[in-house]
C-alpha cells in the first residue's frame, strides 16, 4: 500500500525569490507533494503546479502579482532543476519526483 501511495503523489520543492516569497507567507522554500495525475488522469505539469500554488500555497490575495490570465506573469523567471523552463517545455513540462521549481521575480519597483 505504501508503494502505491508513493506512485499517487510526487514530492517536489518549490522556491520563490526576488520578492515573490511575500505572496507565500514570506516563506522561500516549500516542500510539497502533488498528485501524480490531474483530474483528467494525465501527468501533472507546470500549468497544474501554477494553479495548485495559487489555490493551496498563496496566502496573499494579490494573485495578479504571480499570474496573469492563468499564466505566469511576464517578468517572472522559472527554473526547473536549474534550467530555464523554456528549454523544458514551459507549462507543458511534466513534473518528476524530486524536481526543484524556482520562481524568481525580475520586476523591481523604483
Swiss-Prot record:
Known CDD domains for this protein? Answer: Ubl_Urm1
What does the entry's PTM section describe? C-terminal thiocarboxylation occurs in 2 steps, it is first acyl-adenylated (-COAMP) via the hesA/moeB/thiF part of UBA4, then thiocarboxylated (-COSH) via the rhodanese domain of UBA4.
Q: Name one GO molecular function term.
A: metal ion binding
Q: Where in the cell is it found?
A: Cytoplasm
Pfam families for this protein:
Urm1
Q: Which UniProt keywords apply?
A: Cytoplasm, Isopeptide bond, Metal-binding, tRNA processing, Ubl conjugation pathway, Zinc
Query: Please, one GO biological process term?
Result: tRNA thio-modification
Q: Which residues carry this modification: 1-thioglycine?
A: 110
Q: Where would I find the Glycyl lysine isopeptide (Gly-Lys) (interchain with K-? in acceptor proteins) crosslink on this chain?
A: 110
GO CC term, one of those recorded: cytosol
Q: In which pathway does it act?
A: tRNA modification; 5-methoxycarbonylmethyl-2-thiouridine-tRNA biosynthesis
Q: Which domain of life is it from?
A: Eukaryota
Question: What does it do?
Answer: Acts as a sulfur carrier required for 2-thiolation of mcm(5)S(2)U at tRNA wobble positions of cytosolic tRNA(Lys), tRNA(Glu) and tRNA(Gln). Serves as sulfur donor in tRNA 2-thiolation reaction by being thiocarboxylated (-COSH) at its C-terminus by the MOCS3 homolog UBA4. The sulfur is then transferred to tRNA to form 2-thiolation of mcm(5)S(2)U. Prior mcm(5) tRNA modification by the elongator complex is required for 2-thiolation. Also acts as a ubiquitin-like protein (UBL) that is covalently conjugated via an isopeptide bond to lysine residues of target proteins such as AHP1.
Q: Which family does it belong to?
A: Belongs to the URM1 family.
How is the subunit organization of this protein annotated in UniProt?
A: Homodimer; homodimerization may provide an autoprotection to the highly active C-terminal residue before attacking its substrates. Forms a conjugate with the target protein AHP1.
Protein name as it appears in the record = Ubiquitin-related modifier 1
**Which species is listed as the source?**
Chaetomium thermophilum (strain DSM 1495 / CBS 144.50 / IMI 039719)
Q: What is the lineage of its organism?
A: Eukaryota, Fungi, Dikarya, Ascomycota, Pezizomycotina
Amino acid at each position: 500500500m505504501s508503494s502505491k501511495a508513493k506512485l499517487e503523489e510526487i514530492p517536489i520543492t518549490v522556491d520563490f525569490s526576488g520578492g515573490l516569497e511575500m505572496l507565500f507567507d514570506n516563506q522561500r522554500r516549500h516542500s510539497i507533494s502533488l498528485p501524480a495525475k490531474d483530474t483528467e488522469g494525465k501527468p501533472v505539469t507546470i500549468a497544474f503546479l501554477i494553479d495548485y500554488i495559487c489555490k493551496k500555497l498563496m496566502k496573499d490575495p494579490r494573485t495578479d502579482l504571480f499570474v496573469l490570465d492563468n499564466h505566469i506573469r511576464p517578468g517572472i523567471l522559472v527554473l526547473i532543476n536549474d534550467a530555464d523552463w523554456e528549454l523544458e517545455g514551459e507549462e507543458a513540462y511534466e513534473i518528476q519526483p524530486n524536481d526543484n521549481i524556482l520562481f524568481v521575480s525580475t520586476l523591481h519597483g523604483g
